[in-house]
Swiss-Prot record:
Signal peptide coordinates: none
A family per Pfam: Alb1
Entry GO terms, CC: cytoplasm; nucleus
Compositional bias annotation for Basic and acidic residues: 26-49
Task of the protein: Involved in proper assembly of pre-ribosomal particles during the biogenesis of the 60S ribosomal subunit. Accompanies the pre-60S particles to the cytoplasm.
Protein name: Ribosome biogenesis protein ALB1
Gene that encodes it: ALB1
Length: 158
């Protein structure tokens, strides 16, 4: 066997063997503890979801009152109140969005009714509308200035 500081010592293969052996032990421990289930490809997997221990504790406590299992994770009263408050705010936002959508639908119905009433215009009102449109178009054109002519300083004249 070569000495500890020898150049020809088979360091790489020994280290790789130890590394693969240690990774195998870690994998076996995780399997024994049940941390590898379910697989990422299964439908029950939560691999793409956000992991929140307080939310899991809050919702599991609300759904089942089975306190027979012993856990090391607890939910403080402060955090539970915060979760309840945030759920209340989310529910209020949802109601507000529903009310706004309903108002938009009502406004669309009202605008359709006004459009229906506008079809029954008399020839006099049609003429008035046309004249007012012409007046608004001519008044919105603005003031045109002649360029190239001006005072001796080059400023425009009116």
């Amino acid at each position: 066997m070569p000495s500890k500081n020898s150049i020809n010592r088979p360091k790489l293969t020994v280290n790789l063997n130890k590394k693969s052996q240690r990774l195998g032990q870690k994998r076996a421990d995780r399997e024994r503890k049940g941390l590898l289930q379910p697989e990422r490809s299964s439908e029950a997997s939560k691999s793409g979801e956000i992991k929140s221990v307080p939310l899991d504790l809050y919702f599991n406590g609300k759904e089942s009152n089975n306190n027979s299992s012993i856990t090391t994770k607890t939910l403080s009263k402060k955090r539970a109140k915060k979760i309840e408050r945030n759920l209340k705010y989310a529910q209020q936002r949802k109601l507000l969005v529903d009310v706004q959508a309903k108002e938009d639908i009502d406004m669309n119905v009202e605008s359709n009714k006004t459009k229906g009433n506008g079809k029954e215009k008399t020839p006099l009102t049609k003429m008035k509308d046309a004249l007012w449109n012409v007046i608004e178009d001519t008044s919105s054109q603005g003031l045109t200035l002649k360029t190239g002519q001006g005072t001796t300083l080059g400023g425009p004249t009116f």
